[in-house]
């Protein structure tokens, strides 16, 4: 698990809740507002995307909670070890090696099978491009969701204000109605800035690191 992601997410919500106070939490919960912001913004995001992109985004979003990215120095050490084995015992000796990195395993497998350098570069380069596209689609989906959420929050606030102004005959109801109307704006800001946009940025960063690691593996394998 990626500890930084867990601490950041729980810490952000913890600070918001502590600012509100547990005894006041009931005043900040409104189901229609939740539906407008969370469900409404998701529906609009689906409208501008596709179901496949949504399912792919949910899948890659899980990467933000995992810490599977290897350090470049660890990859270099492993590649040096494989080079030493190949030099002493031949390429075929690499076939029995336990390789946890799927990309490196494919690169070594192609090398052992006798694939030429151009074929390895083209095949693995295409795999990198497909991976980057998949990650980009996931990051773009959450970026779009984060862009739409505040707008849906504002729509919810306007709906609440219209309903409030339509019931001005009871002055005592104006304050509570105004508070409920403003909740959708708060929900939109939280959904965008605490959840969607951080996930989008983290996916982009992880994609860049993973692509750099894959390039390193290609260079190390063909050296």
Where are these regions (language model features)?
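Large intracellular
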Residues: 4-7, 14-139, 210-223
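Helix-termination/interfacial motifs at the ends of transmembrane alpha-helices
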Residues: 2, 7-25, 127-207
């Amino acid at each position: 698990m990626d500890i930084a992601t867990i601490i950041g997410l729980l810490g952000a919500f913890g600070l918001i809740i502590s600012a509100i106070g547990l005894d006041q939490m009931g005043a900040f919960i409104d189901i229609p507002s939740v539906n407008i912001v969370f469900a409404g913004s998701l529906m609009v995001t689906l409208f501008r995307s596709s179901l496949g992109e949504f399912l792919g985004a949910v899948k890659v979003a899980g990467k933000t909670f995992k810490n599977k990215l290897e350090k470049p120095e660890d990859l270099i050490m492993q590649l040096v070890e494989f080079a030493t084995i190949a030099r002493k015992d031949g390429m075929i000796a690499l076939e029995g090696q336990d390789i946890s990195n799927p990309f490196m395993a494919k690169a070594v497998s192609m090398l052992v099978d006798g694939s030429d350098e151009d074929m390895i570069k083209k095949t693995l380069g295409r795999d990198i491009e497909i991976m980057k596209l998949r990650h980009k689609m996931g990051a773009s989906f959450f970026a779009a969701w984060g862009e739409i959420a505040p707008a849906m929050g504002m729509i919810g606030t306007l709906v609440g204000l219209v309903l409030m102004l339509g019931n001005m005959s009871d002055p005592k109801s104006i304050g509570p109605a105004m508070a409920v109307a403003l909740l959708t704006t708060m929900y939109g800001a939280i959904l965008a800035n605490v959840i969607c946009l951080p996930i989008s940025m983290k996916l982009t960063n992880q994609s860049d690191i993973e692509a750099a690691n894959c390039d390193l593996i290609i260079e190390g394998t063909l050296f």
